[in-house]
Amino acid sequence: AGGSITTNSIVNAFNNVIANANGNIATNGDVTAETGKAVLNSKSGSVTMQNVAGNSEVDIDAANNITANGSLTSTNANVDLNAGGSITTNSTVNANNNVIANANGDINTKGDVTATNGNAVLNSKGGSVNTQNVTAGQAVDIDAANNITANDSLTSTNANVDLNAGGSITTNGQVTAQKNVDYNAKGSITTGGIINSTTGNINLQTDAAQGDIIFGGDVTAEHGNINIDVLQNGNVTDDDNKFTALGDKGDINSGNFALHIKGAGDVDLHEIYTTNNAFIDVDNGNLTLAKINGDLVALRLHTEGKQMKVDELIAGTKIIAQSSDINIDKIQQRLDADGLLTIVPDSAQPNKPIDNLNIGEIITNKGVRFDHLWLNNGSINVSEGIFNIDKLVVNNVAHFSNKHMKTAVWGAPPQRDDSDSIYWNNIAVNNPANNLAEWQQEGIKPYKWMYLHFAEQPNIQYSNGILLYLRNYYYVYNQHYSAVDYMLYQLNENKAEEYDINYAPGIVQYFRYDLYDLDEDDNKSEPVKITVEA
């Protein structure tokens, strides 16, 4: 028709139903193509319809808007919707193969969309996309120039769920895919239900001046990785949810979690579990975690003054913690881990000391080794296993303990406390900032810095630190005497002859255990008497 087409009753055809108009098309009754296709094409107007069903394609094109007040069904083929304006479907859209909707304006699917064996593709070039349930045998692919809002579930049975928005993305229901789940937003991302991938990765990314990511449900990659990226600024938070990335042990392609905020933003998450590695890297923000569990766990905050707070950290082989303020209530080693747990702590800037480091409890299978530790103030308690610090610099004071022995290390003028051993380290020499390469290499060599090793045996340490005090029946090797021992010895009544005792010919052993010094005066007829008091 050169103008508009309006049908006020049912339109049935054994083969095809085809309507072409330069104006509007309005079908106020059902349209059915029993063995063929249903085609409604308005070259310069809009298309409004009730139920439309075709045995093969259902193809609707409009220069302006498409409004479906009834269901759209393709029994054996595709449902294709193309609009120069907006698309609104007020009931279900079902296709045996693909459901494809392209619009320059908004797309609103107020009923469920199902592409049984194909793809569900919703693409708004100039507006937003709002959906209910969207299910596809293959990919669910939704793109919007502005925002995407999924008010119910998004499901890909055999492929991917891919969401790309020029604005924000909100998914209020479950998002599940056999393979990958991808969120890419130029605004924020908000999830209200679980996100699950069976054999692929889960990727969420924002690129906005304030691109927050807020999780309202658990996130699980059954055999894949979880990647969260804030390319500019934004917070990453959840509502007491759990992130789980499972996979083959040692596989970089599965079982890993990675979160990176490249600008300003805080991370506040409840629980993270990975088969392999868990990485969190924040350029300018705080980190708060209730629980994180990975074979290797790396937590990095790159701005001075930001705080790292972790209630429970479980790791198999290694922990990297970087922040100027680190507070970890409990560290535990995975039960199946073999060997010492290695902890590598650094400040936000590696050429500066950690301002505060507090670890309430460390429980390991065999022991824990700190590769290096440079701090102003701190406290570390190890409940089980060996406790070794290979390189140690303390600018003010720090306390270290296991279940047998408590130690204080001072860089500031030392004070007596209830510690079993007290050390002082001279911070005026060998500043780690002057030789970061040697400071960061593994092991105690080149012996420029203090080391402190708690032995497995009770009440025994090994250290080259300056020992100020050692409680009776406690031992530090290879040191026999503390500064307090020397000061007490100076009070001995024979100290006036200290030089003769230690340096006179024939008396070469230092510290003679109070042996007397014979007077060589030949005029004395009687030998010196020795009095021993019990």
Question: Model-predicted segments: where are they?
Answer:
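Extracellular beta-strand scaffolds
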Residues: 3-6, 11-13, 17-18, 23-27, ...
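Binding/recognition "hotspot" determinant
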Residues: 70, 369, 379-381, 388, ...
